[in-house]
Swiss-Prot record:
Belongs to the RIC1 family. The keyword GTP-binding does not apply. Residues 1166-1176, 1398-1418 have a biased composition (Polar residues). Disruption phenotype: In mutant flies, axons from R7 photoreceptor cells in the eye fail to reach their normal target in brain medulla layer M6, but instead target layer M3. This leads to defects in synaptic signal transmission. Differentiation of photoreceptors is not affected. The keyword Cell membrane does not apply. This is Guanine nucleotide exchange factor subunit Rich. The lineage of its organism: Eukaryota, Metazoa, Ecdysozoa, Arthropoda, Hexapoda. WD repeats lie at residues 17-55, 64-103, 312-351, 580-621, 862-906. Component of a guanine nucleotide exchange factor (GEF) complex. Interacts with Rab6. Residues 1419-1429 have a biased composition (Basic and acidic residues). In third-instar larvae, detected in most cells of the optic lobes, showing an enrichment in the lamina and the medulla neuropil. At pupal stage, expressed in photoreceptor cells, as well as in the postsynaptic cells that form the lamina plexus and medulla. Also expressed in salivary glands and pupal eye imaginal disks. Keywords: Golgi apparatus, Membrane, Phosphoprotein, Repeat, Transmembrane, Transmembrane helix, WD repeat. Residues 8-521, 711-995 are annotated as: Interaction with Rab6. It comes from the Eukaryota.
Length: 1429
């Protein structure tokens, strides 16, 4: 839980002006003063800021007599130092403090006003003491001193070359005369004490031969909590020396040889966890614990780097150093390299994985060859002495660290946030930010994917990004850190941070430094400090810090009252003692924690006190002691208690009603890594001493949920054991039916089963700092490095260390352990509580993948394979098929036979996907089939899936399937598959067809960007004005997808070839589905299909214009479009007026007005106020199209009159625009803007394909009069009588349906279409010489190619112009004017201009004769039977 940040800095600890190398560094007990030793000098430095205080240089005579300096040892009170020299002598130095209290720094501002300090950071408020260093004496014993260590406040322990241990008093050294050989005050002859070897825990220790004659102690370290010393002898044997009492006499001492360690090089002791670490010449480190039963050594774990490390490349271990809190072990090797390990063996950092650049060989020339390590204040800095000093450069490096708040404040395990603390700053990563922001509740995640049955075209924004953010899990959360700098006013005198805490909501943080307290609000982004600085200096936080319901609670020591206290301060008030609450306790507080409304406190006298907390008001708090427990019997010393908490973890084992749900009954204590559970019985008096149950060992940190909700993941105890991985202690519950029967039958029956809990263990890839119970995720931090400069002379040549937040899912680990122990029901219940998580399928996939990899690659036979049980378990969930295929796709093909031999054949699984409508999963199985089956099988199943995907409108899937089918080589249809997986998503694009196709780029079905000025790319190959026989030869069909052919050959002939029938016809499938969509009036789906699948809609519609694109019921088609688009009903059932009544009222109503229909293009809907909406598109006007048609042709064409465009007297139709209309008659804009854009695009495609029926319906839906005008003019120019009759019938049918329903949406718009009906009637009646039977026989095969000019020769010679007779009762009748030989002949290219008037070329006015009227009435009677209305 320690992580380096920034660059390793070079610091100069030599004498000012010199660059001598430093041989040893040692900090005092409180890590404030740093002693640096060179060959001939001793320097004392202040830790922060790192400045020198005192120096002492030895004389030449002293160097010749005693040799150079080797190492330095501080006295615990920081007043004396013992210096060991190369000759084995001991020099004693005294450190004196100045009595005047003045510091060594005098801050004087310059006289210039511009240079005076204004900012707070420019003032050094720390009073750095003035010290003086002097040599007291030198001690030379009868034997050479090899090493020295301090064992108490007053004693030193010396090891000599004669294999003895000497115990000396500091005071005796002080009063000794110079150069006096002192006799041993207390001598321990190690060759006379027994040494034992305990190879197995159950074996008794046996005596072994004594030490070798020439061996002596080379390395020694003492710990009062283990009652002995860790020692390494000169012959590389490691031992543990223990004494029965503190006098260290030969008769009361014995030793244990460390088993399996024959090449020891260095040793170190962890006081808090009572661990002994021994470094070996093989570059490994072995760690041992003390067995409380026998007092011997018990192997704990081994530290060794194996990843990317060559054997024997590191060399021997030359330094081991535990951090001040015992949470981290720093290891260095002789060949270079530094690593950090957690207490029980989890690797936190290794410089061998750092990026030193390409020019650095870490094996031969490692830049970090270190010989000494020393931790600075609170473990925030690590001093490193390089083995080979560089010329004119300091050999001391300082590496900065941040550490988890759990290291000093274990009660932070209940927080869902990662909080790291530096010496003057905090790093915060809030673990549940996305939960609270986007999900709206704790532990709930929005779905990351669309539903299986969600329609892609269900809304108008289907091709756009969703408005609301979707996140799959907390894994996608931002990994940036929130860095909070400590206020300068507080950090200047209270550096460094000792404790840090954050509330469960992540809104408030509290920090405690050397004295006082400060807290920060993430809402207001402001720090709160004590207004009275003296109150801040009056107490020291010593036992922990936590938040409870808006109060910050701490254990502290009052410097003013000399008492130990519990203090509480509200967050909403200013920091002042008048708002705080104080409770005096009997001894210093070591640790504290909370459970709901209870506070548990451990004091230095070994008493655990439980307090009940309650809020009187927003600013007042009451604390009452509930009971006390004596825990001295379960620990060597209270300082060995790492953490503790109180919980109701085992409430389910008690009969209901014995204890309340909020009442805690269990105390969990971590003593030297052993988890002890103290069960409280509320029915009896609590004894003073308790028997504890050991749940686990080698535990660094544990987590418990304090939530009121009960679930499988919250009723567990989570433990982390370093190299042993993660552990979980969870209850084993019976099935639900048996559980209910047990509750009814009494607690005894239920207790027989429920008294069992199980401890499961599994590995983790990161060090867990936060456990999110509901999300089955652990959060942690990993170190990475970045190289900024590759120059050796640069200050930035060393890598820059950074931190990154990591996460890992552990659900599959727990499920596998439960299934392995035949606890499938418990695993199923746990999985059911997590199945709502978006990454639950991924967890099942990891579960299957781990078992498959382990069993399929095993070289030994597996007697009890776990894969069948895992498959049976996954089969209980609906994601079974998806889990199988996703696991297979991420596994080597060589393992597939083993997987599918137990999971089922891929063909059967594919069929199951189709039956359950899991089409995306079925598509993934095609990859499996392609590699395990012949290509013809995968092609058959892909075609089947393509057909189903089209039916269910899965356009993306259909697109991938088409690419998959096109990627299959036709030559491999019958050949066995090779071991190569072709991904559906990355299948190669189809080969370019040699046939000339229509340019689709400019007309892509873009539903989002809106209308764009389209190229007339289809007009070059699809022309609606050509006769059908010409179109058939000039319009290419849909291009084939499997093979190419010549450009001139029709595509239909190719698709009907024998070879193509043997393969899968993609085009036929697409055309068949497009035909079904068109017949069902699913125009939007047809548009999506063409957009996603690159289907050539215009060319296909040209072929289907007289088949699938032909409508019989226009009103029904319009009704179906409304239903598809979720629009209001166009023809409501309730109606009072029929079409006849409306038509009669129109004939009797007079008035005049001008048309509001313009020639602007798409947006030309008539509005009541006369304004017309104009289209941004630039389309060719109708007049330009007519001018293009004014070319010499076989048809007689009449010229228009100058100054007038009117050829019909449509006075009666002009009155339609001036009729009084109600609100229901007005045109209502019922289409959203984006939907309107899509429909207009479809309309243009239908017009280009000459599909007049659907073009007419779309124009009605869009209420676009200009489009209808263009359609009518195009029909007239096509000279197709049958099409004219169909269009006239369609308009009348729509008009009848509209006026039969009074609430129709198109009532007002249909009124504007009557001139178009009138124009079609006039044109049809103009063909009066054609018999009715001949006109009726004009079928689909001849409507575009029929030549009606022969039948009209007589009429063209007699009739000059037609003028409607407005006085006749029937407005649909024609009257023929007087014939004039000079009149122009009738042209069939009449058009309707923007004002709605019928325009036909006309000459001078004339009167019709009775002969002409009779001829007109006769022709009218003959065509009466041909009319549709």
């Amino acid at each position: 839980m320690y992580y380096p940040v920034g660059w390793p800095k070079r610091v100069g600890l030599a004498l000012p002006g010199e660059s001598a190398s430093i041989r040893h560094i040692c900090c005092d007990a409180v890590k404030i003063l740093v002693a640096a030793v060179g060959d001939d000098f001793l320097g004392i430095w202040y830790a922060n800021p790192l400045i020198p205080i005192a120096y002492f240089r030895r004389t030449e005579d002293s160097l010749r007599q005693y040799g150079a300096n080797q190492l330095i040892v501080w006295k615990p009170d920081s007043r004396q130092l013992a210096l060991l020299t190369a000759s084995g002598s001991l020099l004693l130095y005294q450190l004196d403090f100045e009595a005047n209290g003045m510091g060594i720094l005098q801050q004087i501002d310059p006289p210039a006003a511009s240079l005076k300090r204004d900012s707070a950071e420019l003032f050094i408020k720390e009073n750095i003491p003035r010290l003086s260093l002097r040599e007291l004496c030198s001690v030379t014993l009868g034997s050479v001193i090899t090493t020295v260590c301090c064992i108490s406040l007053s004693e030193l322990l010396l090891a000599t070359q004669s294999c003895e241990l000497l115990r000396l008093q500091w005071t005796e050294l002080e009063h000794a005369e110079n150069d006096l050989e002192l006799p041993a005050l207390s001598s321990i002859k190690l060759r006379d004490i027994p040494f034992y070897v305990q190879q197995q825990p159950q074996q008794s220790a046996r005596n072994v031969p004594p030490l070798n004659r020439d061996s002596y102690v080379a390395s020694l370290e003492y710990s009062p909590f283990i009652g002995g010393c860790a020692a390494v002898f000169s012959d590389r044997r490691a031992a543990f020396l223990i004494a029965n009492h503190l006098r260290f006499e030969t008769d009361h001492m014995h030793g244990f040889w460390v088993p399996d360690v024959e090449d020891a090089s260095v040793c170190s002791v962890n006081h808090k966890f009572r661990l002994l670490a021994y470094g070996q010449e093989s570059s490994a480190v072995k760690v041992y614990a003390i067995d409380d039963a026998t007092g011997g050594l018990e192997f704990s774990h081994r530290l060794i780097l194996t990843e990317n490390i060559l054997p024997d490349s590191l060399g021997s271990v030359n330094e081991l150093k535990w951090s001040p809190d015992g949470c981290v072990l720093a290891v260095s090797w002789t060949n270079g390299g530094l690593s950090l390990w957690s207490t029980f063996g989890a690797l936190l950092m290794s410089t061998l994985s750092w990026d030193f650049g390409l020019n650095v060989d870490l094996v031969c020339q490692n830049p970090l060859k270190i010989r000494r390590l020393e931790w600075s204040t609170e473990g925030y800095q690590l001093f490193m002495l390089k083995l080979h000093p560089e010329k004119d450069k300091s050999n001391v490096l300082q590496l900065q660290f941040v550490k988890s708040a759990l290291s000093m404040n274990p009660c932070m395990t209940t927080s869902p946030h990662i909080l790291l603390q530096g010496d003057d700053c905090l790093y915060l990563n809030q673990g549940n930010n996305l939960e609270l922001t986007y999900a709206g509740s704790h532990g709930t995640f929005p779905s990351s994917g669309l539903g299986s049955d969600e329609d892609i075209s269900g809304d108008g924004d289907c091709l756009e990004l969703k408005q609301s953010p979707h996140t799959g899990s907390i894994l996608t959360e931002s990994k940036y850190w929130t860095v909070l700098q400590l206020p300068l006013n507080y950090a200047a005198t209270n550096w460094p941070i000792r404790y840090a805490a954050i509330d469960p909501d992540g809104l408030h943080l509290a920090v405690a430094g050397r004295t006082g307290l400060a807290h920060y609000s993430l809402v207001t982004r402001r720090w709160k400090l004590f207004g009275n600085e003296s109150q801040e200096k009056d107490f020291v936080v010593s036992g922990g810090l936590l938040w409870w319901h808006g109060f910050v609670v701490m254990g502290c020591y009052s410097l003013l009252d000399r008492t130990d206290e519990l203090r509480c301060y509200p967050a909403d008030c200013k920091l002042d003692n008048q708002y705080g609450h104080k409770l005096q306790v009997r001894a210093p507080v070591i640790s504290l924690n909370s459970f709901r409304h209870q506070l548990i406190v451990l004091t230095a006298d070994g008493i655990v006190s439980l307090f009940n907390m309650s809020k009187n008001s927003a600013y007042a708090l009451d604390i009452e002691c509930a009971y006390e427990l004596d825990v001295k019997s379960i620990c060597i010393h209270p300082a060995c208690i790492v953490s503790l908490t109180v919980t109701n973890l085992k409430n389910e084992l008690k009969p209901q009603g014995q204890l309340g749900g909020d009442q805690a009954e269990t105390i969990i204590v971590n003593v030297c890594g052993r988890i002890l559970m103290i069960q409280r019985d509320a029915g009896e008096q609590v004894p003073n001493t308790l028997l504890a149950t050991c749940l686990a060992s080698c535990v660094e940190v544990f987590w418990l949920s304090h939530s009121l909700e009960r679930c499988a993941m919250r009723d567990c105890l989570w433990l982390y054991s370093g190299a042993h991985g993660m552990r979980v202690w969870l209850p084993i519950l019976p099935p639900g039916r048996e559980r209910r029967e047990g509750e009814q039958g009494g607690a005894q029956r239920l207790h027989s089963f429920m008294s069992k809990r199980i401890m499961l263990s599994f590995p983790l890839k990161l060090y867990p700092l936060v456990v999110l119970f509901d999300n089955v995720i652990v959060l942690g931090v990993e170190n990475e490095s970045t190289l900024y400069a590759n120059e050796q002379v640069s200050h930035f040549s060393l890598p820059f260390a950074v931190m990154e937040r990591k996460s890992q899912i552990y659900l599959h680990k727990v499920l596998r352990q439960l299934i392995k122990r035949n606890l499938g029901y418990s695993a199923w219940e746990m999985a059911q509580s997590c199945c709502s998580l978006p990454y639950f399928p991924h967890a099942l996939e990891l579960l299957l993948h781990e078992v498959l990899e382990e069993e399929a690659t095993s070289k030994q036979p597996i007697p009890d394979a776990q894969l069948p049980s895992i498959l049976d378990f996954i089969r209980e969930f609906p994601v079974y098929l998806e889990t199988i295929v996703q696991c297979a796709r991420k596994t080597e093909i060589a393992l597939w036979p083993y997987l599918f031999s137990m999971a089922g054949k891929p063909k059967d699984l594919f069929q199951m996907c189709l039956q359950s409508e899991q089409l995306d999963t079925a598509a993934s199985y095609l990859i499996i089939l392609q590699n395990l089956e012949p290509s013809v099988v995968s092609k058959q199943y892909a075609t089947m899936l393509l057909d189903i995907a089209l039916q269910q409108r899965k356009w993306e899937l259909a697109k991938d399937l088409i690419r998959f089918l096109k990627a299959i080589d036709p030559n491999e249809i019958d050949s066995p598959r090779s071991s190569m997986v072709v991904n559906v998503k990355i299948a190669p694009p189809p080969q370019v067809n040699t046939q000339q196709q229509v340019n689709q780029n400019a007309d892509a079905f873009n539903m989002v960007l809106g209308p764009i000025a389209r190229e007339r790319s289809f007009s070059t190959t699809v022309t609606s004005n050509l006769p059908k026989d010409k179109q058939a030869s000039g319009t290419p069909g849909v291009a084939p997808v499997t093979e190419s052919s010549s450009a001139g050959a029709p595509s239909v002939v190719r698709r009907r070839s024998t070879k193509q029938r043997e393969t899968f016809c993609i085009d036929l499938i697409l055309q068949r589905h497009a035909r079904q969509l068109l017949q069902n009036h699913k125009l939007m789906d047809l548009g999506y299909m063409c957009a996603y699948l690159d289907f050539h809609l215009v060319s296909w519609l040209s072929q289907e214009s007289e088949r699938a694109a032909k409508l019989d019921d226009f009103a029904g088609a319009l009704q179906a479009l409304h239903e598809e688009l979720d629009l209001p009903i166009p023809f409501p059932t309730a109606a009072k007026d029929d079409f006849a009544q409306i038509r009669g009222s129109l004939r009797q109503t007079g008035g005049g007005g001008s048309s509001q229909t313009s020639e602007s293009g798409y947006f030309s809907l008539a509005t009541p106020n006369g304004a017309a909406t104009q289209s941004p598109q630039l389309q060719p006007s109708i007049r330009e199209e007519e001018e293009e048609l004014q070319q010499p042709s076989s048809l007689p064409i009449l010229k228009t009159r100058s100054g007038s465009q009117l050829s019909f007297d449509n006075f009666r139709y002009r009155r339609l625009y001036s009729l009084p209309t109600s609100e229901d008659d007005l045109a209502v804009d019922i289409l959203p803007q984006k939907l309107s854009i899509k429909l207009r695009y479809l309309l243009q495609l239908f017009i280009e394909a000459n599909c007049t029926d659907y073009a007419l319906v779309l124009s009605i839906l869009l209420q676009d009069a200009a489009s209808i005008s263009r359609i009518v003019n195009g029909i007239i120019r096509s000279e197709s009588v049958h099409t004219c009759r169909r269009t006239e019938s369609a308009l009348k049918q729509l008009s009848q349906s509209t006026f039969e329903h009074s609430g129709s949406l198109y009532r007002g718009f249909v009124l504007t279409l009557q001139p178009h009906v009138y124009l079609l009637e006039q044109y049809i009646q103009s063909l009066g010489d054609a018999p009715c039977s001949q006109l009726q026989d004009a079928g689909p095969g001849t409507e575009q190619g029929v030549d009606v000019s022969t039948g009209l020769q007589g009429l063209q010679n007699e009739v000059g112009e037609f003028v409607p007779n407005s006085q006749q009762a029937n407005g649909n009748q024609w009257t023929v004017a007087d014939l004039n030989p000079n009149h122009q002949r009738l042209t069939r290219h009449a058009s309707l201009e923007s004002n709605g008037n019928a325009v036909v070329a006309s000459g001078s006015s004339a009167h019709s004769t009775p002969t002409q009227r009779q001829l007109s009435r006769q022709n009218s009677r003959e065509r009466e039977g041909c009319r549709l209305m």
